Amino acid sequence: MLKLRSVLLLFAAVSASSLGVQHSVSAEATYPVVDLHVDLPYQLGFHGKPLRQGMGQASLTDLRAGAVVGVVLPLFVPHDVSPTGPRKSDLEDSYLRVLGELFHGDGLALPGCGEAPGVQTWLSFEGAGPLADAPESLDAWVARGIRIVGLVHTEHNALASSSGDSHPVDYGLTEAGKVLMRRAHALGVAVDVSHASDRAVSDVLALARETHGVVVATHSNARALCDHPRNLTDDQLRGIAATGGVVGLNFHSAFVVRGRAATLADVVHQALHLVRVAGVEHVALGADFEGGIRPARGVEDASHFPDLARALRSAGLTQAAVRRVFSENALRVLCRSGK
C-alpha cells in the first residue's frame, strides 16, 4: 500500500508538470488519469500511425492535455492474419512494433508504476487465442510487461466465446481457457472479460472464486442503461467487484446509450450507475480511444478527461471518488499485477 501511495503522489506531480498542465488550472481539472484501454497499437499495426499520433483521439498532445499519466496498450492479432488463425509469431510481431515505438524518443515509457518519467504504459492481450496451445508461454509474456489478459475479442476462439461473434453459439470458457486463466491468476495477472459472452463471463467469475484472482472489464459499460451484448449486467458488475477487479468506463456512443448519439451527460450517467452497483473502488476508465469508436459528444478525445471530472463532481461525486475512478483503482490492479 505504501508503494502504491508513492506511485499516486508521483503521478500527481507528473500530471501538474511534465504533462504540461498549468498550475493555475482548477484542481477539479487536474485529476491524474490512467486509461485501461487505448488502442494505439491497433493504429500502429494496421494503419502505420505512430503511437504518439494515433488517429486524433489519444495523441501524445491529447494525453498531456487530459492529464493522462498512464495507459494500457492492448496487443491485438485478428483471426484473419493467417489462413490457420492467429499465431504466436504474429503476437511477437505486434509486441516488437509496440516496444520499438515505446523506446523511440520520449513521451511514452515502459514499464509503468513510476519506474520512468512520461506517460506510463502497461501491455495487455486483447484476444489471447494464440496462447491456447501453449499456456506456459504466458510466463514469458508477463516478464515482458503483460499485466492483463483478455481471453477473447470480437470472434470466438479456442479460449472462450465472444459477445460479438456473428455465430450465436455461446460455449463459454473452454478447457484451454480455464488452463490459461489459472496460469494468469497464478502469475498475478488480471483476466479481462470485455468482449466475452455472457456464459464466458459467468464461467470466468466462477473460476475466479477458486483461483482467487482478479477479473476486470477494461472497456465496458452497464447493460441496464444500454442494452448491448458488449455491456455488463448488474450481477456481472458485482461479480467483478467481488474479485477486487475494476470496470473501465467506455466512451463509445453505442455502448453508452441506445438509439441516439451519446453525450457527456450520458457518460456521467453510466459512471454513476457503475459506482452505485459495483462500488466506487471498482470503477475505472477504459475510453477505448483509437479503437474505431465514435466517442460521446463532449469526450471526443483524451483532452476532455478534465471535462468529465468536472461533470462527475457536479453530479455529486467527491474529489476522492473521482481520484479513485480516474487513476487509483486502475493502479491498484496494475501495480499489483504480475507479482
List each language-model region with its residue ranges.
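Active-site environment of non-heme Fe oxygenases that use a 2-His-1-carboxylate facial triad
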Residues: 224
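Bacterial N-terminal signal peptides
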Residues: 7-18
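Histidine-centered catalytic micro-motifs
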Residues: 33-40, 196, 217-220
